[in-house]
Amino acid sequence: MSYLSRILEEKEREVGELASEHPARRYAELQGSLAPTRDFTGALRRTGRGLRLIAEIKKASPSRGLIVPDFDPVNIARRYGELGAAAYSVLTDRTFFQGSIDYLQMVSRSFQLPVLRKDFIIDESQIFQSRLTGADAILLIVAALDSCQLGDYLQLAASVGLHVLVEVHDRKELDRAIEKGAPIIGVNNRDLKDFSLKLETSLSLRPFIPSDVLAVSESGLKSSADIALIEQASFDAVLIGEGLYTSPELGRITWS
């Protein structure tokens, strides 16, 4: 069984638990009192000063295990803000990434930068939960959704004020994202089936992303040379997690 299949199987169980919290009903009751979401899409637009950084706050991963033993999401977010991050990505998957929706809430309440909820969204209840807990944007992974779900979830997210980053890994997934009107497309250099990495994935797919769609390169960026390649390919932003922890070189870059 692939990594993605295992994750989605577990996610089905989590969604069953979430149903008992009735997030759709809670959203209907509370929507009038919720603060407006911050402009995640606008934060990623290049202004001629280089790539924008989505800095990922991640405790662990299936491929590497525990990454940050003394994990403090607020302190990590503060450091990334000082580096010049344009937005945050917070892992909320519990089982495989040791994440928590509480981490998202902590970061969202503590800082003004927009926050992306990084998880495996497979049900409408997760979208309502995201809005209720302070996310400004969500990730939709094309490989985890059928075409109807992708279109429906894009519309639902927009209706509750959430921005959406749609993640793809190959040309077929990219075409599906474009067909459904994805406003931001993230090319994941990591294959979610086996978690292998190839930076070439971003470089090969970039020419097929329309000019009016924001393009993000995700995962596997480990050096200033990698960043230069992505910038030359005319991406708007990068999403970096482990690299900011493990590469002193990336930690010294001052992002625009």
From Swiss-Prot:
One of its GO terms (molecular function) is phosphoribosylanthranilate isomerase activity. Transmembrane segments: none annotated. GO terms for biological process: L-tryptophan biosynthetic process. The keyword Lyase applies. Keywords: Amino-acid biosynthesis, Aromatic amino acid biosynthesis, Decarboxylase, Lyase, Tryptophan biosynthesis. It is an enzyme of class 4 (lyase). Disulfide bonds: none annotated. It catalyses: 1-(2-carboxyphenylamino)-1-deoxy-D-ribulose 5-phosphate + H(+) = (1S,2R)-1-C-(indol-3-yl)glycerol 3-phosphate + CO2 + H2O. Its EC number is 4.1.1.48. Pathway: Amino-acid biosynthesis; L-tryptophan biosynthesis; L-tryptophan from chorismate: step 4/5. Belongs to the TrpC family. NCBIfam families: PRK00278.2-4. This is Indole-3-glycerol phosphate synthase.
